[in-house]
Structures are given as structure tokens and as C-alpha cells.
Amino acid sequence: MASSCLFNASVSSLNPKQDPIRRHRSTSLLRHRPVVISCTADGNNIKAPIETAVKPPHRTEDNIRDEARRNRSNAVNPFSAKYVPFNAAPGSTESYSLDEIVYRSRSGGLLDVEHDMEALKRFDGAYWRDLFDSRVGKSTWPYGSGVWSKKEWVLPEIDDDDIVSAFEGNSNLFWAERFGKQFLGMNDLWVKHCGISHTGSFKDLGMTVLVSQVNRLRKMKRPVVGVGCASTGDTSAALSAYCASAGIPSIVFLPANKISMAQLVQPIANGAFVLSIDTDFDGCMKLIREITAELPIYLANSLNSLRLEGQKTAAIEILQQFDWQVPDWVIVPGGNLGNIYAFYKGFKMCQELGLVDRIPRMVCAQAANANPLYLHYKSGWKDFKPMTASTTFASAIQIGDPVSIDRAVYALKKCNGIVEEATEEELMDAMAQADSTGMFICPHTGVALTALFKLRNQGVIAPTDRTVVVSTAHGLKFTQSKIDYHSNAIPDMACRFSNPPVDVKADFGAVMDVLKSYLGSNTLTS
């Protein structure tokens, strides 16, 4: 049996408490870590260990890569993955090695990364839970990464030496206690801060996978001279950083005057070749696809399904942070729409492999100025119509013709999902409200929070539902929008929750008068 590969005392999990913090705390802190012994594909023990609880002492001349090489197992890897057409018809035999440079199926459709689920199923859910838990908080290469700690489910065949990682992932799952209670009447609201990452957005999760595979392809002498992407900001930041780390040239197509300066400076600082093009994201996307068809530049946009393999680990991580309890709702901002499918894929793999018994309902939240999925949903999933996106403060999702529309629709149908939208005023107000309770979120998270407000008001999400809002980028990338909001400088917007600074003379009496007015006349009485 596969479970014979896991040596671990049988300890029952503590019963969940009503207090969200107690429910959230991992019981793994109260038990011994497992010792994982390497197994053949049929579950029989073999001599060489994959991981052991006790490792040889660290040699001072080793870095973590050297140490990983020295401790490398000679065990046969039973896991594999390949490209297949997305949502292929039953009986389809079309497939491609991950070492091939291919982005579309023969019919022109999207590709997906398909894992050998039968090989993965030879090990039960308890095995995978304990293996993933045993890697948390470690510096062992490459498992200290929140992505590569799930390597067997991501790129199982890549050599550790080819991996390009900043130990991304492992991002904070924040209990939004005050915000939930004050504004929504909720006691179990969480924000998954994927923007607390190497380059400040969730795109790092996918880019570590894609650039690692490119690193492998280049070592195999495949024709890849660089990696290119079209971007609304965050993709280019992640691509340029990971390529710089590996010494791989990066080429970035950006829509002129449509991203924040904080986003623009990241690829420039990391040495990318940046083209500022007089078009929108959809125009940049069209150009990069045409260019990569003619030049040996590897395409890094989410048309490439490798990125979704890294992004799906955020879903697995949420379950792990809840000690493998499933939340009721997960709300994800959507632009190019790969991320909503990635989250679905992560949750679904956990269900299929026995780590959990169900998946959450998901919500995709769009800006009203760039809402083709929302309109498609409201039409009853009738014929999808691309649109020309208007300017939105949520610039990273200002996309009118999303590449992953089919993936998003598939995921939402499978999880009984919902699509909501947010106007500019709604998303900025939601961002300000969240910030006033101790967060510092991006406008895209404001879109997701607006969706939550609407679904709470409609009674769709109950006050006791455990709900996770996915925050996709760091608020520090979008400070100008916050400055404009709190300065009441946005035309035709009331900025109801603005908090502008108060000008006051450098005089003791003047300062005292202002403070008494703010705090109440009796507060400062001696």
C-alpha cells in the first residue's frame, strides 16, 4: 500500500473550534513531523531516501544548491506530466512533452499540463498532506519555496539544478477581523496576500515555473534566445526578475502610459529590454504572439500553461494554512483569467488525490470597465464577445479579450461559481475601507472586495461562511491611486473614505486645538 511509505504516529486532528484563529492554527505543530521514505511506483520501499527527518550536517563550504546535490536521492522518479489540449474530447491522444516549445493544440486551442494522476494516486492524501507540511519553513533547496514544496504536482521531472526560485509563495493568510466585522458582519474573512512576494504580485508563482523550464530548455540547447511577454505590469516585473536571476534575456511589451511607474521601473531595473507600445494590452498580446512565432523568443504569457502550474499552488497553500479544511468561498480578481482556472485546478487536484473531500465555490471579480467575463456570465454563458477595455485603476486586469476565457468558464461551471463586477468608485472605496482597518491593498483586491460586498448584500455569502479574498499584488505598486483618492483629486468620485492630512501652523495652541477637535475636548484634559 502507498501509505506504508509514511512512518508517522497516528494522531487524530483536534476538532475545529468556532474561533477562526483556533480553526486556522495547524495541529501539525503538536505532532512529530513525518519521516518520508522513497517508494517505487507500486508503493514498495527502496533504499534511497527522497527526504529524511534527519539530514547530514551542513558543510560550511556548501550553499543550499550544493547541499541539495550532495543529498540527492538516486530513487526513480515515478511522476510525470505532459501538455494536452485543454478540455480535450474523450479519446484524444494528442500530447506533447514539456520539453517541446508549443503553445497551442493542433486545432489552435489552449493547452493544459496534465499530470500522471494514477502515479500520484498510488500515495494517499495523508502522505501528500504530511509531505507538503514537512517542507514548510525550511531552507532546503528547492522545497523552501511555496511552489516547489509541491514539486511533484508542478514540474515533477525537472532537475533541481535547473530551478530558478526566490523561495516565492508561503504568503500570508490574513484574518481580516476588523474589516469583516465592521463592514460585512463577518467573523471568518481572510485575505490571501499573494502580493507579498518577490516582485510584489502573484505572478511570481507562475514565473518561477516557466523560467525554470526555459532554463532547462536552454541547457538542452533548444532554440531559446530569450523570454518575452506582453504585460499590464506585474507579469513583466516577475519575468524580468526571474530571467535576471538565471542570466536569461527578457523582452517586455508594455502598453504606453497604461501602467503605474512602480510597475514600469521593475523590468527596467532588472535589465529587461522594454518596448513601450502605443496600444493597449490586447494589442501588445497580439504583437508578442506574432513575434514569438517568428523569432526564438519563448512566450511567457498565460497562453503558456506552465505558469498556471505555479499559480495553482496558492490554492493548495490556502488549504494547507487552514490545516486542510476547505473554505466556503474563494474570490479572485480576473483579467486575462488564467488565475481563476489555476485556483480551480489546485483545489481539484487536492480533492482528486484525497487531501480534501470537496472544493470551495469560487467568484471571479472584474472591473466594470473591463468586464467581458461578467457580461458573458450574465448572458447565461451565451456567445462570448471581446470588448475594448476602458481605463481602470485596476490596471493589471484592464483586458477586454482574455486569453484564458475558456479556462475561466470551465472552472466556474465546475465549481458552481459566480462572476461579479466593480465600478471605479466601488473598487476605490473598498480599497480605502480595507486600508483603514490595517491592510494596504491594491485596486484589484478592491475589485474582489467589492464583489464580496455585493454577494453579502444579496445574501449569497452568509456571515458565517469562511471566505478567502485573493489579493493579487502589493499596494505599494499603486500608491498614486491612493494619493489621488485621499487627496479627493479623482474627478467625479466622492472619495467617501478619504483621509487627507490636516494643515496646521507650527504653533502649540493650534496643534492642541486640532487634536482636541479630533479626539474630543475631554480626551486631553489633564
Curated annotation (Swiss-Prot):
Annotated binding of S-adenosyl-L-methionine 2, by residue? 172-173
Function recorded in the entry: Catalyzes the gamma-elimination of phosphate from L-phosphohomoserine and the beta-addition of water to produce L-threonine.
Q: What is this protein called?
A: Threonine synthase 1, chloroplastic
Q: Which organism is it from?
A: Arabidopsis thaliana (Mouse-ear cress)
Any idea which UniProt keywords this protein has?
Answer: Allosteric enzyme, Amino-acid biosynthesis, Chloroplast, Lyase, Plastid, Pyridoxal phosphate, S-adenosyl-L-methionine, Threonine biosynthesis, Transit peptide
Annotated compartments: Plastid, Chloroplast
Q: Which GO terms describe its biological process?
A: threonine biosynthetic process
**Family designation:** Belongs to the threonine synthase family.
